[in-house]
Amino acid sequence: MERTFIMVKPDGVQRGLVGEIISRFEKRGFKLVGLKLMQISRELAETHYGEHKGKPFFEGLLNFITSGPVVAMVWEGKEVIATAREMMGATNPLKAQPGTIRGTYGIDVGRNVIHGSDSPESAAREIALFFKEEELLSYEKTLDTWIYE
């Protein structure tokens, strides 16, 4: 099964959206295999968002993501990366479809509630940044036979 990294950003935590976001992923049939409430260090933020280094918004992004607690998660399921991207909606909430997480709860591109991996490679990299292998659980969900062929 495929895995993806999902993070509820400080705005989502402060607004009390963690439970709603987890609920959406569970209702979609995905399995939660890792979960942490944490404060991101500047060093971790710089590594995580390294692809944006040198861009005009980089410093603001680092300040925001380290401004409060986040909820880091690993979800598992069939095509979970692509499906999670659809569930989250466009990065800019003003362009996100109604009903998506960002379309429903996002304020602006800098306060868009949630981050999710965009490829299998980024998922593997981000999961390894935030979780040790022993922090991820493998287990059988009794519903799996009702969800997957």
From Swiss-Prot:
<feature type="active site" description="Pros-phosphohistidine intermediate">
    <location>
        <position position="115"/>
    </location>
</feature>
<feature type="binding site">
    <location>
        <position position="57"/>
    </location>
    <ligand>
        <name>ATP</name>
    </ligand>
</feature>
<dbReference type="GO" id="GO:0046872">
    <property type="term" value="F:metal ion binding"/>
</dbReference>
<comment type="function">
    <text>Major role in the synthesis of nucleoside triphosphates other than ATP. The ATP gamma phosphate is transferred to the NDP beta phosphate via a ping-pong mechanism, using a phosphorylated active-site intermediate.</text>
</comment>
<dbReference type="InterPro" id="IPR023005">
    <property type="entry name" value="Nucleoside_diP_kinase_AS"/>
</dbReference>
<keyword id="KW-0808">Transferase</keyword>
<keyword id="KW-0479">Metal-binding</keyword>
<keyword id="KW-0963">Cytoplasm</keyword>
<comment type="similarity">
    <text>Belongs to the NDK family.</text>
</comment>
<keyword id="KW-0067">ATP-binding</keyword>
<keyword id="KW-0546">Nucleotide metabolism</keyword>
<keyword id="KW-0418">Kinase</keyword>
<feature type="binding site">
    <location>
        <position position="102"/>
    </location>
    <ligand>
        <name>ATP</name>
    </ligand>
</feature>
<dbReference type="GO" id="GO:0006228">
    <property type="term" value="P:UTP biosynthetic process"/>
</dbReference>
<dbReference type="Pfam" id="PF00334">
    <property type="entry name" value="NDK"/>
</dbReference>
<comment type="subunit">
    <text>Homotetramer.</text>
</comment>
<feature type="binding site">
    <location>
        <position position="9"/>
    </location>
    <ligand>
        <name>ATP</name>
    </ligand>
</feature>
<dbReference type="GO" id="GO:0006183">
    <property type="term" value="P:GTP biosynthetic process"/>
</dbReference>
<feature type="binding site">
    <location>
        <position position="85"/>
    </location>
    <ligand>
        <name>ATP</name>
    </ligand>
</feature>
<feature type="binding site">
    <location>
        <position position="91"/>
    </location>
    <ligand>
        <name>ATP</name>
    </ligand>
</feature>
<keyword id="KW-0547">Nucleotide-binding</keyword>
<keyword id="KW-0460">Magnesium</keyword>
<dbReference type="InterPro" id="IPR036850">
    <property type="entry name" value="NDK-like_dom_sf"/>
</dbReference>
<protein>
    <recommendedName>
        <fullName>Nucleoside diphosphate kinase</fullName>
        <ecNumber>2.7.4.6</ecNumber>
    </recommendedName>
</protein>
<keyword id="KW-0597">Phosphoprotein</keyword>
<dbReference type="InterPro" id="IPR034907">
    <property type="entry name" value="NDK-like_dom"/>
</dbReference>
<dbReference type="GO" id="GO:0005737">
    <property type="term" value="C:cytoplasm"/>
</dbReference>
<feature type="binding site">
    <location>
        <position position="112"/>
    </location>
    <ligand>
        <name>ATP</name>
    </ligand>
</feature>
<dbReference type="GO" id="GO:0005524">
    <property type="term" value="F:ATP binding"/>
</dbReference>
<dbReference type="GO" id="GO:0004550">
    <property type="term" value="F:nucleoside diphosphate kinase activity"/>
</dbReference>
<dbReference type="GO" id="GO:0006241">
    <property type="term" value="P:CTP biosynthetic process"/>
</dbReference>
<dbReference type="InterPro" id="IPR001564">
    <property type="entry name" value="Nucleoside_diP_kinase"/>
</dbReference>
